[in-house]
Amino acid sequence: RYARVTGVQTCALPILLTEIAREIRVGIIDAVHSAKSGHPGGSLSIADVLTYLYFEEMNIDPKNPKKPDRDRLVLSKGHCAPGLYSALAHRGYFPVEDLKTFRHTDSYLQGHPDMKHTPGVEMTSGSLGQGASTSCGMALANKIDKTSVRIYTILGDGETEEGQVWEAAMFAAHYHLSNLCWLIDFNGLQIDGPIAEVMNPTPYDTKFAAFGWNVIECSAHDFDSIEAAYKAARECTDKPSVIISHSIKGKGVSFMENNVAWHGAAPNDEQYEIAMHDLGER
């Protein structure tokens, strides 16, 4: 529905991106409500980041989704597929109305991303930690081939409790994968509660710095902050970058914000109407 927004006057860019992000959030709620299942909380918390990546940052073409020089996004926190699908739909990879087939039998929009069935999905994901490793492999291959391709990865903060993430972090620094940029969706909540209580993976800044990464922080719901973070990542040419993205789980829907109950639950009809009102659709 939207083309890439590059070329929009700088003063108008955050306004346009904010509207796109709002529509992406509407798509997320439509998807999980239709399926009566799914993961809205963490999908809503990355909606602004997904908006910036797909509509401003990444070199992609929905009309030619397999072009060799395209940038790649790996959604390592694959349970947040509703966010990815809504971003892809609004970017033009498939019809927005198909979001309401999410998790339905025979739909190409299943509960976790599948690179063999869904246009625009670069890596099948859902087993937490694996996207961290596969994105490293993508980055190394493109470094060997001397391409201009950049690899973007989104991980959950709870996901960083997986040991595989830290093995991948060591690998990326060892091979100086400056074409790799991870973003950690730091909303502080996972399915069992606050990450600090379940298995505290912080502090991220000193840990990643010790591993040899370029560490950046941003506000996940401020497009100026997101833009500055990805610009800083691009300017780093000798090591991988990680963005610690401070977010609000369930952002945009009043009763879902900072509420762990909405990690993996769908709104009923009454709650759906409240969510649509919160998102400006009523």
What is each residue range found by the language model?
Residues 79-80, 84, 187-188, 222, ...:
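Glycine-rich beta-alpha junction loops
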